[in-house]
Structures are given as C-alpha cells and as structure tokens.
Amino acid sequence: MMTRVRSAVSSIIGGIMASGTGAHDSHPDLPLRFPYSRPDFLALSPDEVECSADHISRPILILKEMKLPWATGYAEVINAGKSALNEDQACCEVVELRKRPADPSSVSYTPSRRRSSLPSGDVLDTIHNPEVKELDFHYWALFDGHGGSGAAVFAAKFLHLHIEEQLQEVLEILQDPGLQPPTCLGEESPNPQLHASASGSQRGLSRAASLRGAAGAPGSPNTMAPRFFMEKKIKQESLVVGAIENAFKEMDAHIARERCAYSISGGCTALAVMFLLGKLYVANAGDSRALIVRAGELITMSSSFTPESERQRLQFLAHLQPSLLGSDFTHLEFPRRVTKREIGKRMLYRDFTMNGWAYKTVQEEDLKFPLIYGEGKKARVLATIGITRGLGDHDLKVHDSDIAIKPFLSCSPEVQVYNLCQFEHGADDVLILATDGLWDVLSNQEVADAVSGFLGNCDPDDQHRYTMAAQDLVMKARGILKDRGWRIAGDRLGSGDDISVFIIPLMYGTQQPQPS
C-alpha cells in the first residue's frame, strides 16, 4: 500500500495529478441520467458542441444573443487536454416560488421541473388571492467537475429545484417582509406592540373574569402560555441562508440515490448565486470564486475550500474517527515526510488544535503518509483530491485501496449575503463568478482591474458589453498558444484548465434592462 501511495505522490510532485484523481467505482453498464451537453443558454448544435471540444485551438464560447436576465455576460473555454470534455457546467434561471401540494419531506419526492404545466389548487388559490405576493428568484451557478462530467451535469439540472423546494417551506413567511419567523410553525409571530396592549388589558381583568376563563384571561384557550426563557430573534435572511444550505445537502443526497440507477461520474464544486427580495446570496462549496467590483472597490464574496484552508477540520475528523485513515495514513502534519532514521528525534509537527508549529518526538506511527500532503494547488487529501467541499464523489477511493474519500468531503456551502438595496450601482458595477481555471493564473485584483478597464472603454448602454468582458477575461486567462504552451501577459503560463465566467451587472437588481 505504501508503495502505491508513494507512486501517487510522485505524480503530484510531477504536477500531472488533476484535482480529482483516485478510483471512482463507476458503473459503465448503467445508463446516463442526462447526456453530456454544454449549458442550454448557449444554444449550441451537436456539431458546435463537438467543435468546442478542440484542445488545440480552444475556441472561446459566448452567448449568441442576449437572453440571460440582467443582461448577464457569459464565456467559457475547454481545457488544454486535461480531460476529453469540458467538465465545467453552468446554469441560469428565473424560478417562480409557489406553494406546492406535494410533500417535500417524502423520500421519493424529486423536483423535476421549474413550473407545473397545469396549475394546482394551491396555485389557483394564490392567483385569485390578491393579498398573496408572488415571489421569484434569479439564479446563476457554476459547477466544476472532476473525475467525469456526470455530477456537474446532474447538479446543473437540479440544484435550483432543490433551493426552490426548500424555500417553498418558508414561502408564507417570506411573502410578508415585516414578519419575524415564528419559532414553531403554527404559532403567531411575536409582535411587541400587540403584546404590550394585551398585557395592559390582561392586568385590567378582574379576578372574577379570570376565574370565568374570559377570552384573553390567563388560562383561557386563546392566551399564549407565558415564556420564562430567552428566545432568539431570527431574521428572514437566515431562513433563506438555511434553505440554501439544506438544498446543497439534499442535492448531494440526490446524487447518491440516483447513482444506484444511473451512471453519474465524479464530483463537482458548486458556486451558486441567488437574488431574492433585494439581496444576493452567494453560496460556495469548493474552489471557484465570486467577487464584486463596485466603484473600483473589490469585495470578495466567497472563500476557497482546499486541503490547506480546511486542514484543522480534516485533522479533527481523522482524530475522532481514525478508522477512516485505514492503516496507512496519519492525521498529523509534518513539514516533510518522516524517515525511519528520525524516529526518536524531535521534529516539527502540527495537529488539529494548532495554527502554529511545535516539536514532538517522532514515533514509528508518524512514518505513515500524512492526511494532507503538498502545498498550494498540489495539496491533496489522502494523496487523491485537491478540493474539500463539493457535490458527488460518493464512490471515490484512494487509488488501489478501500479507503473512502467522501467522509472528508463536505457538501456544506459558505453563504455570504450582499444587500443590493443599500448601495447605488452603476453600469460598471458587477458580480464576477468563475471556476478555478481563471483564478489559477489571475489574482482577484488582476480580474477586477481587467473587467473595470474593459467596461470603462465600452458604451454604457451596450448590453452586450458584459459578454464581451467575460470573453476578454477568459482570453486573458487562457492566453495565446506559443512554442512553450499557452502563455499570458508577462510570458506567464496560461491556464490549461476549463474556464467558465459569469459577469452579472448589479444595477439591474433594482431596475430592468431596456432592449437595445
């Protein structure tokens, strides 16, 4: 086993390991859940899809016509040969929220479409009730696949439907912006003014009225029981965040169920943005990134989750459940591999409780391969995978072993919130979403400067400028093919990975784009 691990590590050092390697127990005899394709909004023919997979010329694909909400721009390019297909996927939708009669808690419940073709009774009630406010949310998402495109394609089809399903459970609360979410559904939400009035009336009740059980008297059926404990006040924003978090969890479980009947290869990172009730919710599980450029200021809206950034979480899990490591890995981190001749010596190490380093006496068990090995983009979990959050990877194992990787991978996203209504946004203020193929070669500041510089030279009334800016950004990261490979500005190595970019103008969060 150690020989196999050393062989895997030599591949890492050689720089040829992809972010998701190892053994995926695929099921070649099972049918595909969905055929491979590029995003629907690109409207590519089968011939165009085939041409887009040219690893030599690497054509940059953009929108043929402006059809995405908010005049959103999009561009993508395939990798330089890392995988046969572009394993990135993208999705953009406007989803209506309506209460459905189906029971979302049912195990067999699976969202299958965005809108019902025939209105249900609940929907008809909503249509005929003018007091009920209909809601919808705008949705953009990028999925960076590894070990195959199956999980990314599947997540692109379903994640927004799982978010819809979760939001439907709190729809009636969200329809009333002034309503504080009740602690228990079915209870009236506390209203301070109402409580003050009720308490004043209650004090005025006579003892006789109390004994008779008059309405509003203590002990009457219509009186809420007094509470003698503190109760947190939860904001509606937190309900939306919780819905997104649960949707990611349900999406991951959905993949796990469906892979028993269909071939769903690999896993994927997920970066999703939702606009609802004046706020942007940015949810990230993986190493894609989101950032806002507003009046020249750069605002990061996501964190990258890698073996290095999540070292302590991974080490703590391995400490609690050492069986997950098999007999060949240790959860401790050392500056380099420990050798036999160093047994008994004092060596630098780091455990899950530590940000810094300390010395320990090396023991024989420290010769095991470390849970996290390598630095930067070459850091790997169990010598196998370079990301720590995402969807799928249910069958991924350490090469030629039975050690599962999935227990160390989290599907939980980090969700950040940006209130669009708090700021005035101009035509050059944008939200940029991109997979790691872009960020591998360009810093946040370089990306912000490139987009600001490009938009600054465009007609502010030209709504195609955002797609052109996305194309320019992809070109800057891909570079130009030369004798020594793809090169970008400064003769640096260009990105050989798949690259997908959304550029979303923020001013349309409060106003709709007018036709050009």
UniProtKB/Swiss-Prot annotation:
This is Protein phosphatase 1H. Belongs to the PP2C family. It is an enzyme of class 3 (hydrolase). PANTHER family: PROTEIN PHOSPHATASE 1H, PROTEIN PHOSPHATASE 2C. Residues 106-506 form the PPM-type phosphatase domain. Gene3D superfamilies: PPM-type phosphatase domain. Keywords: Cytoplasm, Hydrolase, Nucleus, Protein phosphatase. One of its GO terms (molecular function) is [pyruvate dehydrogenase (acetyl-transferring)]-phosphatase activity. Residues 190-202 have a biased composition (Polar residues). Residues 102-122, 181-202 are annotated as: Disordered. It catalyses: O-phospho-L-seryl-[protein] + H2O = L-seryl-[protein] + phosphate; O-phospho-L-threonyl-[protein] + H2O = L-threonyl-[protein] + phosphate. Its main location: nucleus. Its EC number is 3.1.3.16. GO terms for cellular component: cytoplasm; mitochondrion; nucleus. Pfam families: PP2C (PF00481). It is found in: Nucleus; Cytoplasm. It comes from the Eukaryota. Coiled coil: none annotated. GO terms for biological process: signal transduction.
